[in-house]
Structures are given as structure tokens and as C-alpha cells.
Regions:
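Active-site-proximal, substrate-binding regions of enzyme catalytic domains
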Residues: 1-87
């Protein structure tokens, strides 16, 4: 199964991408862009945005987010998708 996460989920819990067991996680590109806009804020939302971006960037170093990057042992993969590739 795949779960599509939105901006609110990621900002509420920066570790949300690791919370769905062996299921795959999809983050639409526009959600990643929205999170990126908040990173300069000095608020909790800004702190959460920076944390989300750090986690995704660390995963990106392991492979292509378009092809899916494993999130860890007994976890699914993370995909960042353009809206037309959401399936």
C-alpha cells in the first residue's frame, strides 16, 4: 500500500515518513516545495520544515527519490512524485 503525505502531516511530525511500516510513502513534489517555503521561519513550523528537508535530503543521497529510496529495515520506500506520476 502507498500513503500520500501532505504538508500538514510532515510539519506536524517530521518523522512521519518512518511511521507507516512496510508501506511506501509518496510525497508530491508540490508538498516538498511547500515545506521548503517554511524553512526560514523561526517558529516551530520552520524548525519542523528544516528537519523534514534534512531527512529527505539524507535519503536522496542513497538513491533516486523518483525510483524510490528504502526508508530502512522493515520499512517501505519513499517516493517524491510529480502529480502526473502519482500512481
Amino acid at each position: 500500500m502507498k500513503y500520500v503525505l501532505d504538508t500538514n502531516v510532515l510539519l506536524h511530525d517530521p518523522n512521519a515518513i518512518f511511521s507507516f511500516g512496510e508501506n511506501d510513502i509518496v510525497i508530491p513534489l508540490y508538498v516538498f516545495d511547500e515545506v521548503d517555503k517554511f524553512k526560514k521561519e523561526l517558529s516551530q513550523r520552520g524548525k519542523s520544515a528544516r528537519e523534514v528537508i534534512r531527512k529527505i535530503e539524507a535519503l536522496r543521497e542513497k538513491g533516486s527519490l523518483l525510483d524510490g529510496v528504502p526508508l530502512g529495515e522493515n520499512l517501505g520506500k519513499l517516493y517524491v512524485r510529480y502529480p502526473k506520476h502519482m500512481q
